[in-house]
Amino acid sequence: PAERIRNALSSIISQTGGKFIYTNSDLQLSYKQAKESTELLELSKLVVKIKSCHANGIPLGGDINPKSNKFILLDTGLYLHECDLNIADLVSKSPADFINSGKLAEILIGLELQKSTDAFTDGSLFYWHREAVNSTAEVDYLMQHNGAVLPIEVKAGTRGAMKSLHLLMKEKGIALGIRTS
C-alpha cells in the first residue's frame, strides 16, 4: 500500500493542472487501486480534490461530474520539494524560466481560494472541463459569488490566451470572469 500511495502522489504531481487520469498513475496499478490511493491522500488532507462542474448555475456542487477531477497538493512547498525545485532559484529567475510555473500558480491560487471560503462550507473547489469532438476546454476554478458562477483562469505570467474562459462565459451567459497570474 505504501508504494501505491507514493505512485499516486507522484502521479498527482505530474498531472497537476489537468484532469486526473487514474490509469496514468502507474502501469502496475489497476483503476481501483489508483482511485483508492488518491482517496487515502485526500482523506489525509495531503491533496485537495477539485471537482468538475458543468457551471449551469449555483450551487456548483449540485452540478458535478464525478468522473472528472483534478488534484493539487496541500502546500506549494511540498510541490517544490517533490519537483526538486529550489525556492532561491524560483525567486531569482523569471517565471518563464520554469516549466512548472503554471502548475505552481494553479496550486497557489487554489489553496488561497479554498482558504477564502466561508467557514460553514466544506471548502470544495470546482473547475469546468469540456470535451467535445476535436475540442477540449478548461477553466481552472469556479466560485459562487453574489449568487452567480464566477470563473477564474490562472496563468503563470502576463501572456496567454483566455479562449476557454471566454468560451465558458459565452456558452453559459456569465457576465464576469477573472484572469489571474
Residue ranges, per PLM feature:
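Conserved helicase/translocase motor-coupling segment
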Residues: P1-L43
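A cross-kingdom feature that marks ATP-driven nucleic-acid transaction machinery
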Residues: E39-S181
